């Protein structure tokens, strides 16, 4: 509710929050109180002057005061007001709204005696009431924020005191930059701090960042390099270094700086060393850090931008019409002024009408007319709908409530429903014309399953794994069923007590329980400590993803990897085949080339609720930790490993000298046809005795035979939990584990991998070069434990890896063999992509120590740089990632989500043009497009894949010419069109699809080709942009939106989709497995793509229709009622006199006629949800804005003028010649106007419920009750008028009832006849669909069938006509490529048949070659 209140005042709050440093206030989002936001929705602030952080110690006192003492403390203040400034500041903010200023001007104007229209005090009442209500609401909200701020600021943490020389309890608000802070497990980090110590022996700290980015997976942060090898906790008194870093900014993914020791030695700092405010320490007993940013300068607080404000298309249209109403008001007031001047001129000589001023002066008619103009402004002010904007906001809140209450949006597996984060653009959901969708995680499940691989040029189909996936169904475990039976989700169960950070044994089944989803209660000290904490389950760890079935051929080859084979000391004449060593390196790369965190599956992750923070002393956690230290068993130590240090003992030189990983062995191909292409390589002569071999086996921990090891998974593998940042990494690690190459542990210094036949090997981790969208790859630099060589393992997109391969390999193969491997792998990659698999290439590089030292020196300079660090690091990575040796490729399957094809088809029928923007390769994207029905088998597909900008322009011209011929439109006629063809125009042209690659898209986005590109895409129903970067995605959305002037809707699930989500009219985030960045940046968040169809086709249609008609109704009722006052001016000399008491005039719009349109705007349903989903083409009415066109607005005003004429002159002629007074004449006018206005809404309503009727009758009764009470009790409220008994007298007069009935009938007759004729003679598609809802089920089904059949026949006929026209023309340069692509992509059934045949052929000799040639 707080967010709703914040949004209502967001547009004027921005102008008054620019305060400095600790006292500045920013809009606050209480959804994430401690973290204050998610992924930054604003452009990162440029770092200006660098920040120098000096330790808060006695020895640095003077320097500290000069630097760190000038920074803000950790106190936060999100309140806006104080007791002294509340009234003036709140009024200042409220008067930033133009409507409030307008009515304030009218109040002041009414205090001018010459233009006064009503009693002065009365005119102030409406504005005062509105301002008071909003002020009370703002005050209560601000007081609530004050209490929460106070609670947070008074939280306790451990801060090192330079006076007491120890850590003491200190409030968060007193923490300053330079303080040393000690945190325990499960504590929330109070400020941004650099990690200096961790109790973990490897210098690792685990944190949970769900408050920042929504990701529940644990993240690793590491101690600053040089502080890892500490035997004891860091002593602040011995800390003699200083920190220099960038100025505070809101970029959560970046931290640049360095730590400079007393000897001027520098150590680079990155985000891996930074603990952010709002995160929680997990699985680490204690950490120590130094504060670098505090309070409002922390990254979390800088990301707290509050709710974003967007204006909908309908709101912009309404604002334009408000200006037309202002113009109409001015015209009516000018008419009144001129009329009064003319009237006075006619009676200038008659003193009865020309009364002089008290001083005897006579005012000229011209000046009097000027005064009357302003009097008329006050009198007719209601023409500007003051209650319109308030009513719109109330209606939108009601619409949001019903959207969020729709059970069809509930995802039972994720226990989540739709989130409406933008509250003012619901109606735009009904007018979307372009949809931009990510692929992975949006259209697909984002459950990456290892499907196939290619190693050393040989394809491995994994047939058994394919069969498992086809028949796989995730079964609910007995434990989960029991949980559901006992009380639903864990969030609804009693919270377990907080536990220590040591490992707790898992349950009897050995399966991890669901992760805790709620906050725990405060740590108690009562009994019942026997509660077992629920264990957590990592993401990307469902059985479908983890249970990989190995390929038997590949497993047989990998089983040849024995200690004797590696060392060449088996006493035989054979040497190890090169292919086996390729396989070994391939799986090593899969296991270690990632950032996967390895942990036990049953480690508890307790959460601390805000309600318990204030009363939870730190010593409670310490007591619980001590209990578990006494009760738990020490972590079992790993077996003896061959780390870089250990393996050098003994006689390593002799051992390593005899190992030749790439020492000219020969390939041993399994297929005859492929083996003929590879030359044999001379053997290496190696010999040794058995005794030496056994010693070496013991040195590397090889204690089991390969046959025994391969018979089952390693004993410890089932106890490991992999937490990956992306599902691809997890899938590759699980695939390596399936081949008994198990990632056992990872620290900042080393990675341990367990081989079935070799035991555990420890790789010294030298560097990790993370993935980025520029390089499209990641690498790890390790020192091999056996060869002692520096090896670079790289994985990434095939488009970039293939360009980085070395011509002359250093592994004993000649260039011809490398070329054969490369060509085979490329054929396999193309085949994988055509099957819709996600592809990656794996490569390696061996470096000498000299080469590595030279690269390291340059890389160190990049790491310690603050300015341009990202660019320098990319350049350094590119210097390393070259001259690679290709090891193989992987194909990972990511299945479509349930209901995606049906949703895509429905959105197509709704006239929405859909673009797929993906980073995958072309073949994969096209295959998924066919699978999800974005493309149909008979669609004409055009491919844009060029290497130059000129070629791109020529190809686009050729494709455009072909499309124009297919549409039977000459190029001259097409080029003469001012506007591009819209989606609805393309229905009769035959469907066309366009595929464009990332590099070609870069050319197309150039200014010289933008218009041509947009014109081409406007002719296509579907566009696929593959290999697109996040920046290109946002540029495409902006280009289409700005040039076509259409409403755009991007949808995505990952951080790479945030940019395009933010630049569009409506952004949709999918809450998937890649964190919550997209959700936090979106306007609406859903859990599955199929929910989008109902959100747009049903709720979008309803919201647009309701709000459009409600806005038109407000204009109608205000114009109709104000014109009664205007027509009366013709009979009172345009004097600005009202025939209605001002109290009635005020409440007529604010009370008697305001509630029914609000109910209409919330509950109106022109067509049922079932019909809207079955007939998606009804959505096109919203795209064409049929409910609210400019013509509709002016027709509504003309109808209002007509009804006001009838409402005025029927009573006028009825009472003409009678002796009734002015207010007695005005009473039947008001009563008839009330009936006309309320019944007008009844005629416009498509679905009347008991709520509609109750509100309508209630409005009428409240009017009569008020009129009777006012006439009896408020006789002298508005002197000199006397309303005593007016309504009572009229209710006793039959003529009054006759006048009201006759007036209402005559006024509404044209509107009623128009609606009758519209529904019977020329019904719109929406009205026809409305009739279907009234039919019995059998007749309704038959009617819908006829509707769809007619639409299908028309569509097929138009398609056949366009295809015949296309066949008569000459083919374009792109058509041959299209035919090739279409021939390679078939329907779903044919594709499954072909895949089965390929799988069978893959296991037979010679089949791989045949498959590769056919694919090429």
Curated annotation (Swiss-Prot):
Its main location: membrane. One of its GO terms (cellular component) is mitochondrion. The keyword Cytoplasm does not apply. Changing residue 716 to L: In strain: CAST, MAI, MBT and PWK. It is a multi-pass membrane protein. Expressed at low amounts in liver, brain, testes, and kidney (at protein level). Expressed in placenta. It is found in: Cell membrane; Endoplasmic reticulum membrane. Residues 514-523, 976-987 have a biased composition (Polar residues). One of its GO terms (biological process) is phospholipid transport. It is an enzyme of class 7 (translocase). Its cofactor is Mg(2+). Autophosphorylated at the conserved aspartate of the P-type ATPase signature sequence. The active site is at residue 438. Keywords: ATP-binding, Cell membrane, Endoplasmic reticulum, Lipid transport, Magnesium, Membrane, Metal-binding, Nucleotide-binding, Translocase, Transmembrane, Transmembrane helix, Transport. Residues 1-97, 142-321, 387-1110, 1164-1192, 1243-1252, 1311-1416 are cytoplasmic. Residues 498-544, 971-990, 1358-1416 are annotated as: Disordered. Its EC number is 7.6.2.1. Residues 1392-1402 have a biased composition (Basic and acidic residues). One of its GO terms (molecular function) is ATPase-coupled intramembrane lipid transporter activity. Mg(2+) binds at residues 438, 440, 1053, 1057. Residues 119-120, 343-365, 1132-1142, 1214-1221, 1274-1289 are exoplasmic loop. Component of a P4-ATPase flippase complex which consists of a catalytic alpha subunit ATP10A and an accessory beta subunit TMEM30A. PANTHER family: PHOSPHOLIPID-TRANSPORTING ATPASE VD (PTHR24092:SF84), PROBABLE PHOSPHOLIPID-TRANSPORTING ATPASE (PTHR24092). Belongs to the cation transport ATPase (P-type) (TC 3.A.3) family. Type IV subfamily. This is Phospholipid-transporting ATPase VD. It comes from Mus musculus.
């Amino acid at each position: 509710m707080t967010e709703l209140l914040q949004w209502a005042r967001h547009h004027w709050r921005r102008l008054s929050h620019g305060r400095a440093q600790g006292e500045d206030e920013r809009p606050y989002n209480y959804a994430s109180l401690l973290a204050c936001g998610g992924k930054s929705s604003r452009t990162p602030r440029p770092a200006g002057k660098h920040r120098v952080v000096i330790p808060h110690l006695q020895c640095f006192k003077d320097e500290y005061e000069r630097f760190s003492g000038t920074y803000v403390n950790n106190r936060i203040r999100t309140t806006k007001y104080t007791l002294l400034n509340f009234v003036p500041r709140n009024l200042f903010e409220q008067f930033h709204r133009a409507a409030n200023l307008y009515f304030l001007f009218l109040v002041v104007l009414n205090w001018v005696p010459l233009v006064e229209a009503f009693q002065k005090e009365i005119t102030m009442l409406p504005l005062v009431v509105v301002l008071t209500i909003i002020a009370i609401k703002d005050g209560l909200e601000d007081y609530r924020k004050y209490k929460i701020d106070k609670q947070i600021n008074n939280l306790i943490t451990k801060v090192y005191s330079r006076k007491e020389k120890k850590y003491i309890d200190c409030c968060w608000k007193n923490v300053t930059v330079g303080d040393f802070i000690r945190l325990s497990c499960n504590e929330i980090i109070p400020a941004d701090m650099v990690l200096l110590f961790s109790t973990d022996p490897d210098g690792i700290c685990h944190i949970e960042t769900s408050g920042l980015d929504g990701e529940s997976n644990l993240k690793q942060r590491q101690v600053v390099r040089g502080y890892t090898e500490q035997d004891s906790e860091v002593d602040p008194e011995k800390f003699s270094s200083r920190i220099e870093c960038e100025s505070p900014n809101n970029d959560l993914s970046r931290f640049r700086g360095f730590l400079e020791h007393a000897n001027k030695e520098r150590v680079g700092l990155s985000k891996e060393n930074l603990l952010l405010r709002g995160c929680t320490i997990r699985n680490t007993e204690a950490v120590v850090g130094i504060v670098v940013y505090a309070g409002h300068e922390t990254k979390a607080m800088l990301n707290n931008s509050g709710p974003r404000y967007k204006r909908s298309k309908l709101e912009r249209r309404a604002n334009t019409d408000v200006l037309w109403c202002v113009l109409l008001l001015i015209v009516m007031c000018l008419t009144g002024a001129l009329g009064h001047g003319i009237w006075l001129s006619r009676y200038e000589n008659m003193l009865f009408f020309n009364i002089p001023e008290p001083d005897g002066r006579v005012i000229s008619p011209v000046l009097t007319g000027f005064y009357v103009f302003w009097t008329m402004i006050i009198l007719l002010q209601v023409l500007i709908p003051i209650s319109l904007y308030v009513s719109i906001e109330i209606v939108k809140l009601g619409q949001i409530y019903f959207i969020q209450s729709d059970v069809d949006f509930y995802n039972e597996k994720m226990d989540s429903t739709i989130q409406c984060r933008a509250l003012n653009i619901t109606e735009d959901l009904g007018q979307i014309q372009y949809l931009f969708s990510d692929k992975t995680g949006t259209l697909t499940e984002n459950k990456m399953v290892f499907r196939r691989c290619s190693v050393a040029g040989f394809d491995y189909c994994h047939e058994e794994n394919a069969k498992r996936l086809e028949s796989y169904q995730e079964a609910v475990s007995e434990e989960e069923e029991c949980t559901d039976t006992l009380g639903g989700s864990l969030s609804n169960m009693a919270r377990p007590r907080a536990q220590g950070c040591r490992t707790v044994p898992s349950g009897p089944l050995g399966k991890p329980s669901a992760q805790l989803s709620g906050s725990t209660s405060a740590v108690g000290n009562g009994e019942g400590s026997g509660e077992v904490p629920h264990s957590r389950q990592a993401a990307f760890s469902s059985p479908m993803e983890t249970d990989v079935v190995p390929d038997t051929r590949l497993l047989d080859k990998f089983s040849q990897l024995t200690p004797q084979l590696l060392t060449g000391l088996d006493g035989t004449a054979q040497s190890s085949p090169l292919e086996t060593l390729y396989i070994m390196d391939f799986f090593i790369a899969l296991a270690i080339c990632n950032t996967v965190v390895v942990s036990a599956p049953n480690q508890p992750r307790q959460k601390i609720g805000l309600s318990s923070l204030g009363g939870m002393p730190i010593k409670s956690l310490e007591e619980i930790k001590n209990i578990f230290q006494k009760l738990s068993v020490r972590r079992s130590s790993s077996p003896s490993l061959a780390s870089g240090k250990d393996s050098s003992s003994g006689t390593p030189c002799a051992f390593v000298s005899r190992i030749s990983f790439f020492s000219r062995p020969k390939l041993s191909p399994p297929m005859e046809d492929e083996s003929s292409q590879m030359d044999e390589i001379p053997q290496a002569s190696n010999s040794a005795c058995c005794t030496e071999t056994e010693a070496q086996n013991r040195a590397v921990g090889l204690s089991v035979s390969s046959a025994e090891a391969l018979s089952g998974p390693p004993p410890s593998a089932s106890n490991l939990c992999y937490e990956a940042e992306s599902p691809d990494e997890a899938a590759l690690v699980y695939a390596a584990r399936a081949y008994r190459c198990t990632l056992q542990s990872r620290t900042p210094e080393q990675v341990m991998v367990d081989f079935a036949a070799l035991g555990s090997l420890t790789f010294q981790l030298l560097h990790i070069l993370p993935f980025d969208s520029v390089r499209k790859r990641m690498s790890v630099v390790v020192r091999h434990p056996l060869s002692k060589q520096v090896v670079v393992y790289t994985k990434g997109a095939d488009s970039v890896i293939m360009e980085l391969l070395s011509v002359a390999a250093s592994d004993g193969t000649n260039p011809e063999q490398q070329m054969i491997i490369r060509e085979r792998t490329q054929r396999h990659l193309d085949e994988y992509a055509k099957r819709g698999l996600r592809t990656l290439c794996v490569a390696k590089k061996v470096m000498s120590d000299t080469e590595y030292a030279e690269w390291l020196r340059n890389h160190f300079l990049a790491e310690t740089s603050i300015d341009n660090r990202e660019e320098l690091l990319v350049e350094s990575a590119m210097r390393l990632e070259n001259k690679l040796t290709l090891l193989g490729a992987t194909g990972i399957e990511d299945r479509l989500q349930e209901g995606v094809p049906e949703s895509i088809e429905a959105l197509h029928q709704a006239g929405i043009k859909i673009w797929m923007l993906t980073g995958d390769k072309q073949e994969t994207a096209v295959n998924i497009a066919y699978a999800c029905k974005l493309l149909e088998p008979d669609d004409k597909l055009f491919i844009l894949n060029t290497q130059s900008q000129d070629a791109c322009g020529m190809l686009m011209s050729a494709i455009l010419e072909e499309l124009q011929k297919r549409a039977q439109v000459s190029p001259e006629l097409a080029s003469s069109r001012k506007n591009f063809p819209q989606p609805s125009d393309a229905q009769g042209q035959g469907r066309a699809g366009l595929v464009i690659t990332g590099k070609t898209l870069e050319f197309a986005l150039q200014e010289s080709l933008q218009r041509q590109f947009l014109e081409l895409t406007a002719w296509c129903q579907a566009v696929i942009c593959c290999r697109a970067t996040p920046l290109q995605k946002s540029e495409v959305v902006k280009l289409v939106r700005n040039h076509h002037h259409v409403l755009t809707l991007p949808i995505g699930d990952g951080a790479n989709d945030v940019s395009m989500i933010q630049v569009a009219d409506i952004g949709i985030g999918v809450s998937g497995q890649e964190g919550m960045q997209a959700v936090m940046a979106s306007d609406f968040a859903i859990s599955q793509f199929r929910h989008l169809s109902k959100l747009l086709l049903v709720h979008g249609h309803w919201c647009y229709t309701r709000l459009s008609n409600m806005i038109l109704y407000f204009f109608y009722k205000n114009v109709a009622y104000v014109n009664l006052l205007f027509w009366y001016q013709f009979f009172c000399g345009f004097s600005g006199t009202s025939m209605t008491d001002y109290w009635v005039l005020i409440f007529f719009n604010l009370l008697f006629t305001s509630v029914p349109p609000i109910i209409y705007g919330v509950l109106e349903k022109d067509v049922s949800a079932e019909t809207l989903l079955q007939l998606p083409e009804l959505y096109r009415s919203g795209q064409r804005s049929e409910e609210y066109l400019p013509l509709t607005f002016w027709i509504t005003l003309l109808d209002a003028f007509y009804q006001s004429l009838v409402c005025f002159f029927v009573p006028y002629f009825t009472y003409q010649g009678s002796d009734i007074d002015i207010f007695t004449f005005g009473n039947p006018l008001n009563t008839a106007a009330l009936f006309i206005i309320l019944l007008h809404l009844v005629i416009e309503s498509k679905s009347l419920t008991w709520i509609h009727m109750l509100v309508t009758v209630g409005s009428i009764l409240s009017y009569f009750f008020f009129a009777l009470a006012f006439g009896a009790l408020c006789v002298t409220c508005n002197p000199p008028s006397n309303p005593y008994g007016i309504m009572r007298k009229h209710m006793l007069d039959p003529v009054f009832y006759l006048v009201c009935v006759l007036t209402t009938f005559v006024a509404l007759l044209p509107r009623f006849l128009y609606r009758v004729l519209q529904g019977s003679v020329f019904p719109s598609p929406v009205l026809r669909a409305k009739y279907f809802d009234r039919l019995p089920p059998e007749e309704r089904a038959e009617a819908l069938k006829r509707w769809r059949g007619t639409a299908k026949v028309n569509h097929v006929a138009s398609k056949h006509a366009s295809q015949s026209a296309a066949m008569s023309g000459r083919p374009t340069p792109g058509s041959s490529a299209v035919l090739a692509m279409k021939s390679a992509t078939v329907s779903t059934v044919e594709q499954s048949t072909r895949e089965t045949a390929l799988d069978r052929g893959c296991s037979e000799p010679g089949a791989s070659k045949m498959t590769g040639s056919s694919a090429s």
